Design a protein with these regions (language model features):
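Metallocarboxypeptidase
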Residues: 1-295, 300-307
Length: 307
């Protein structure tokens, strides 16, 4: 899946003056030159040639990380939440399994992309929960930083954009705030950091369009040099709705969202080392001493010190 650029005098995008393969936002008031609309490659519904342009709806539009009970909000606040908490059989099965296994001490839900290690809470500031818990979250996450190079971030303090209207119902929040389990969401693959223009993850501090373009250009250059099979130059294409357009750009799924295939094993090896260290940090049941004393025939007193 690539991008489509469609010529239109009403478009918000222009070809970059230094590199025509790059699309940049036009300046307000700029009316000179060629303009384009940019969409993900695909078809559209209810298009009458002028208005009512609507991309095809996803078949299910479910987001499992909005369907867990803790902090759940309905669809009118967050898309993908489902009809009610645990309405999806997959999330219900996960919750049931965890509840049935009280020996679980830690979980990690592994996402793409971004190159960060997120930890709860995501529904309130980190200062509102146990300081001991937060210190433990940071201490274990720093193991991940050593292995992966990813920064640990609290979800509420440093990741969400709107503290008054945040999305919730996430797996990690439910694990921690409902079940008392140490839980992380690891966003694997850090292309922006690799190209030297890392993302600013405090989402409340919006970066400029110039910084976004700088990172995009650097990412495109990196992909062309290191994974050229995941980039295509713009090529003419006849679209059934828009006529003559162009299709090209990144294969987003395997360049920015996930590592290119040749980089996948390296990321997985780093993540595996973190997960092993995470598991080794959990409490382990041991029997320190075990003694027996004969009380009478066929009766013994057994003493065990469990630590």
């Amino acid at each position: 899946i690539r991008m489509m650029r469609i010529p239109t005098p009403y478009g918000a995008w222009k070809k970059d003056k230094d590199d025509s393969s790059i699309m940049a936002k036009g300046d307000p008031g700029d009316a000179d030159g060629d303009f384009y609309d940019i969409y993900v490659e695909g078809n559209f519904e209810a298009f009458d040639g002028d208005e009512n342009l609507k991309e095809k709806k996803e078949d299910w539009s479910l987001d499992f990380n909005r369907n867990y009970p803790y902090g759940w909000f309905p669809e009118n606040r967050q898309a993908g939440a489902g009809k009610y908490p645990l309405s999806n059989p997959e999330t219900k099965a996960m919750a049931d399994w965890i509840i049935e296994h009280p020996n679980i001490g830690g979980v990690s839900t592994n996402h793409t992309s971004g190159g960060i290690i997120l930890y709860p809470p995501g529904t309130r500031p980190s200062t509102a929960v146990s300081e001991k818990d937060i210190n433990q979250f940071i201490e274990i996450a720093n193991m991940g930083k050593e292995e992966l190079g990813y920064e640990p971030l609290n979800i509420y303090d440093s990741f969400i954009a709107d503290p008054a209207n945040y999305d919730s119902g996430a797996f990690d929040d439910w694990c921690y705030q409902s079940q008392g389990i140490v839980a992380y969401t690891v966003e694997l693959w850090d292309l922006a950091k690799r190209v030297g223009v890392p993302l600013v993850w405090n989402a409340r501090n919006k970066e400029s369009a110039q910084d976004e373009l700088k990172r995009f250009v650097a990412c495109m250059k990196w992909v062309k040099e290191n994974a050229p099979e995941y980039y295509e130059d713009w090529k003419p294409f006849h679209h059934e709705t828009f006529g003559d357009i162009e299709i090209g750009g990144f294969n987003f799924k395997f360049s920015q969202q996930n590592p290119p295939e040749s980089f996948l094993n390296g990321v997985l090896e780093q993540m595996t080392r973190f997960m092993i260290r995470f598991a080794q940090s959990m409490p382990r049941l041991t029997i320190d001493t075990l003694t027996s004393e004969k009380v009478s025939d066929d009766i013994y007193k057994v003493t065990a010190i469990v630590g």
